[in-house]
Regions:
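Charged phosphate-binding loop/patch that engages nucleotide di/tri-phosphates or the phosphate backbone
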Residues: 124-145
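Amphipathic, Lys/Arg-enriched alpha-helical patches that create a basic surface
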Residues: 114-124
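Divalent metal-dependent catalytic cores for phosphoryl transfer on phosphate-bearing substrates
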Residues: 1-116
């Protein structure tokens, strides 16, 4: 899979920064984002994107990849899609290790197909667990149909 250097750099930066504030105190994340209603676990991505933007980051695709990496975004380019997949397929996760390992091995050969599968798996898990399905997630799924 050939990736232009500029895009490759965005993928690396997204992977490096997307969870930078994952363990930050919730009051700090709410202060950064101004968000008083979203679930705690969804605040770190937007907070990182806001901080990066304040520090001068101008690559909107990178900022959007990080901002929406927990819920998805139908308007993502390859950077957002790659981060969404990587976040789900990361080897350190305990669930469905074999299935995720197989999917990860297929990314270079079938990027869009694997992305669709990851979105489907994440959506199915949310439904099965009785979690709220965010509008961004629904819009992402519908954009892939």
């Amino acid at each position: 899979m050939r990736i232009p250097p500029e895009e490759s750099n965005a993928w690396i930066d997204a992977g490096t920064w997307h969870d930078a504030l994952r363990d930050a105190p919730v009051p700090e994340l709410r202060a950064i984002t101004g968000d008083r209603t979203s679930p705690d676990g969804l605040l770190h991505g937007p907070a990182v994107a806001i901080k990066l933007e304040r520090e001068g980051e101008r690559r909107q695709n990178l900022l959007d990849a990080i901002r929406y990496h927990t819920v998805g975004n139908a308007r993502w380019d390859q950077t957002g899609r790659a981060l969404y997949m990587a976040d789900y397929l990361e080897p350190g996760r305990k669930f469905l290790a074999e299935d995720r390992g197989f999917l990860a091995s297929q990314v270079p050969h079938n990027f869009d197909g694997v992305f669709r599968q990851v979105v489907r798996f994440r959506l199915e898990w949310s439904v099965r667990e009785g979690n709220h399905i965010f509008p961004e997630t629904v819009e992402l799924w519908n954009s892939l149909r």
